[in-house]
């Protein structure tokens, strides 16, 4: 019994050793093969950041603002249709019949654009004009300005009792009170000067001029920039009589360009 037992033990051990070597060899072969099969997976993993970067770039490209459309000089023909709604208060040709609403006929395109922009931004406050200006594009504003600029303001009539004082202030100012002459910015005949800040005043309704000067006198401003402070600083030096005289004089002021043609004999 003891002999068989001793003889059996080496056989078992030999088989076990052989099995261990076989398993070890298999494991080594599997390890040698693993890098070859995992290489594509690594390449796939490496490709993911690039794909992620591409995906991240897509929203950025989508959210990039579109190029701003170039604004062209105003087109009076296009402006006529766009200005139709303005006619309810300002008249279809810019000559308002209600003196609380300013005449726009003959006003410069640049000035009209500037005021519409101010209404839209809220720097010049007026609930009605805010609603009118809000949907307008910059091109719309230029077209509307060009249309009204092409029209001729109808002449007004000044109060003869106020003309002398109004003319003096308009042409000479009052150096003693540090009041400059109006014509320095608005020209001697009231047609204004180039640019957006010096409007035409000829034939403007006296009631509108008076109300505007009084508002400036009382501290109302149409913006925070330096130009917007000029008229309030001047109006605060004017008396009630000064304002009435200037407003009446301006209404009766007619530039030669705005005179109606003489009747044929």
Label each region the model flagged.
Residues 2-15:
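Bacterial N-terminal signal peptides that target proteins for export
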